[in-house]
Structures are given as C-alpha cells and as structure tokens.
Regions:
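Catalytic Tyr-X3-Lys loop
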Residues: 20, 41-60, 75, 79, ...
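A conserved structural motif in NAD(P)-dependent oxidoreductases
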Residues: 150-161, 172
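Short, small/polar-rich loop/turn modules that mediate ligand/substrate recognition or access, typified
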Residues: 17, 115, 120, 176-178
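Active-site loop-to-helix junction immediately N-terminal to the catalytic Tyr of the SDR YXXXK motif
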Residues: 38, 89-97, 109
Length: 190
C-alpha cells in the first residue's frame, strides 16, 4: 500500500535523519517447490499479478517514495534483489521469474533517469540459496546437482548475496549503476 510505504519512509527518515540506501527485496506468497509449481497451462493471470504486485509494484512504491529525498541529497542507492532464473529457468517458475526479469528493466530505467542526481540503481540476482525459507523444500540432491554445475562447486549462500549488496551500498561502488550482478557461483556465466 502506497500510504503505508510513505509512512515507513517518513518514520525511517525521522528516526535516522535521512535514508541513503533502499533495498527492494519482496517475495509474496511463493515457495520454490517444483512439485507444487503450476504448469503454464494451469496458471492464471492472478498468479502472475500477485508476483508482479509484490516485486514490481512494491519496488515502484518504495522507490518513488524515497526519490524526492535522494534528489534533494544528490545521492542515494537503490538495490533490488532479482534471480538468475531469468537467464536459466531450470525450474519454470513462470510468474516469479517474469516479475524478477521486469525488475531489471525497472532498475535500468531508474538508473538512466536518476544518475544525474548521484543516485545509483542496481540488481543483485542470486541463484538457488542454501538455505532460506523459500528454498527449504529443495532436496539435497538438487543442491548437490547445482553445486556440481557451478565453477565454484558450491551453492550460493545468503551471505554471498549479502556481500554484493554491501559492496553496492558502499562508496566503493559509486561508479556502478544500471547493472544486474549475478551471484550464483558462475552457474549462468555469460
């Protein structure tokens, strides 16, 4: 809800004095369970809409709410969390992957328009993460298979993704914007 987001931004600004970094990391009602995933023929537009609303509408509302402050400060950092599945849909999570792919376009447009104000915008796209609430149903065999197909011979951890987020939020990354950086152990090298 846009009003709730505006209140959240206002509360955070009052508490911290200003906001420097926004991380868009919404996941609405989704589990990475290939056995429960609907096939495309069984999906409804409402299934898509739920993921589009959580991912894109959520990022839109948060980003639009904080932009006036970022423009006034002449700085700000927007980091959105994506997925490597848009490059290699090993499991066709249609609605989730489509929403996250849209997040890349959203982010690149924000970067192009707002860079003139010192604002950076990037996406960090993780692979299968070991282990999160969303990947809790993933079998050990799948984790092993992914590990064996990556050059690093490991499954990405939440800490691996967090490390990239911390880098992009730092002053060392002020020259990085409009990028989708994939953190998946090299699984989707391109």
């Amino acid at each position: 809800d846009r009003n709730d987001v505006n209140r959240m931004i206002q509360t955070a600004t009052q508490h911290f004095g200003k906001i420097d970094i926004v991380i868009n990391n919404a996941l609405v009602g989704f589990k990475f369970d290939p056995n429960q995933q609907k096939s495309f023929k069984d999906l409804t537009w409402e299934d898509y809409q739920q993921q589009l609303n959580g991912t894109l509408k959520g990022a839109f509302n948060v980003t639009q709410s904080v932009i006036p402050q970022f423009i006034e400060q002449q700085s700000g950092c927007i980091i959105s969390i994506g997925t490597n599945l848009y490059q290699n849909p090993v499991v066709p999570y249609h609605e989730y992957t489509t929403a996250k792919a849209g997040l890349i376009g959203f982010t690149r447009n924000i970067a192009a328009e707002l860079g003139q104000y010192g604002i950076t915008a990037n996406v960090v796209s993780g692979g299968l993460l070991k282990t999160t609430d969303a990947s809790a149903v993933t079998t050990p065999e799948v984790f092993d298979l992914i590990a064996q197909t990556t050059p690093l011979r490991k499954v990405t951890s939440p800490q691996d993704v967090a490390n990239m987020v911390v880098y992009l939020a730092s002053d060392e990354a002020r020259g990085v914007t409009g990028q989708n950086i994939t953190v998946d152990g090299g699984l989707t090298m391109n």
